[in-house]
Amino acid sequence: SQEFYENMLRGHIKNKDVLLYKDGAQIGRKSMFREGFPHEICCINEHVFILRTNELCTQNYLYFWLDQPEITQKIRNLNANAAQPGINQAGVKGLPILLPLKSLIDDFENISEPLLAELFNLAKKNNLLRKTSDLLLPKLISGDIDVEKLDIKSINGVTV
């Protein structure tokens, strides 16, 4: 609930946060939150790290660095508890990150940022379409919404 979220002292997700799952079956899985996707407001629990960069690197670079198979394997190898798979904060802070020249990171950002912005924008639109479909389809099937008199001849050049 909104009240629960507001009472949380830690773990609030910010735009472009990179999340790293630290235990369980999904250890090493990465996510990025942007522009309210997948949720407008969100917070994490104790099973996830929020990773935020400093001025040496960008969130986009960090996400793609972590998403490499070799780095994912290094993360999984940090597993400090065989009974319950998991990684700790010290292990994550000790992960190597190759930082190219700042100019190259800036170039990467200039290329990746508009692509990621569009990707997340389309993902939000897909969610909205899915929700709209979930609301409308049962009403259409049951006849609650009558489409007999709709004047739809074509949609985007496709004859209906």
Predicted regions and their residues:
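Extracellular/lumenal ectodomain signal focusing on beta-strand-rich modules
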Residues: 15, 29, 94-96
